[in-house]
């Protein structure tokens, strides 16, 4: 039986993400002044490109694998089979990615300027094959991530100060990231196998491809969802200078510092909690969602408001006066934490837990096709401001469509009395005091 570890996991993931971001915050003022906007542009362009391979290798298993295991956590045979299917599938996806990456190096002109950075980042993708997040997430045991990331962040900070001395030393940053990711993920993978007595069962190829095929809708939804960030950067590369990309990606990366610290811990921790609630009954799961909706909306609205108000102070303090142009961009996208939080709540937490994978996929596909077409026009016409507006537009369109289809399906996730601060406090206390999930 599980103890309710939702808030414990949110806290642990929050500490983990703070560690991931706090140490870069310390190094950012130093690094930004050495490598400048152009160096940041090179790093961020390569990172955005390699990000597609990360999505491909991770596939949808942090969602589908977590949901399957958390709903059958007591069935040891099922857990081992699901665990093995994920790992073998990722191995196949990594081999396919290797072929695609080599082709992109030969034919992708944009990568020729910084192919060393791209190669370093791609080598690090072996860590994605053994990424154990879905395992720890399924067992609602995420405390270890905070400890590991504190140690990694401190060592990485020291190495950056020691090795990054000139504007040509920017390649050390992805190098350190690659090395740490490989060792940490493989180590956590081995530890999870021992702790939960997991067995890696050999999977036939037809079974592996069957798993990949069955999860295609969630995977494609994740990929096209990534268009909201990475594709903006890729498209901008056709219309603006590397220096201007540096301005845009600085604001985007700072935004996702906020998202990683506040958004990811909450969404990651509540997903298995909601999924387990739906395993009891649809009614129980729906009631849990209704209680969580107002809590997340208030929290993300306050976070976005703070980001809007304090953007000038934060950008100037961290990056220096050379990045003043990033302030207006960050203010334009300040409410993305709120819109992104609503997209995740309606799509991942609700539609996927109701098993509407195809609907989730179709909504994301439509919104991102519209956003992709519009992004070319806006980026060409308005530069990085156009890309920023497009980011907001896709989120808002997704939210509207999710609400529309939930209404058609007669799924009501809004209970207005739960928006009362007094009721929110009561619901928080009841969740914290809950001793068991089943």
Which stretches of residues belong to each language-model region?
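Interhelical loop/hinge segments that connect adjacent transmembrane helices in multipass membrane
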Residues: 1-6, 143-146, 170-177, 186-229, ...
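Membrane-water interface segments that mark the loop-to-transmembrane alpha-helix transition
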Residues: 8-20, 46, 51, 55-105, ...
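Transmembrane helix-bundle signature of multi-pass secondary active exporters and lipid flippases
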Residues: 47-55, 225, 248-268, 272, ...
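Helix-loop junctions and terminal segments of transmembrane helices
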Residues: 58-74, 251, 255-282, 286, ...
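Interfacial segments at transmembrane-helix termini and the short loops linking adjacent helices
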Residues: 104-121, 309-339, 385
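Membrane-interface junctions at transmembrane-helix termini in multi-pass inner-membrane proteins
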Residues: 115, 125-149, 335-363
